[in-house]
Amino acid sequence: MATDETKRAAQEFLAAQFTEAVQIEEERLNAQAAFAFAPKVWKRVVETFMAQCEAWNAITKTESLTCKETILGDLRIRCAGKPDIITVHYDSRKLQVILRNTARPEHEGDSTFFIQGYNGGTEADLSRNNQRANLEVVVLGELRVLAGIGRTAK
């Protein structure tokens, strides 16, 4: 004979199983979305860098930043009069975007971002430390470091 406590425990068990199944399905959908939307995310990264460089140059009224895509598809950004360079590399197999900025202090390594799916597989975006990355802020910070004026305004 089942007591109320037994019924409650069995219901909790069923709820936990259902929640776990839903979580597994969402993770599967998000992984599929990451692969499906990765080229679009990379395109947005390229467009953001290009747009920020164009805006920077429009404000300075000179070609102080040059942003070019290499034959391999990487981005290279240079600042006039500076020896340093930003290289942005997209690894489609690992779903990674790697930013190398030679103007960064040595103790700061490359910035690695992952392309992850979100919202049950309906979208994908860059993330770092399992948090969505604000691409515009990241790009502006990297350009500021490249130009030698520091990551943030004083």
Regions found by a protein language model. Give the residues of each.
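Generic signature of mature, soluble extracytoplasmic domains
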Residues: K61-R78
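Intrinsic disorder/low-complexity polar-acidic segments
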Residues: G73-K154
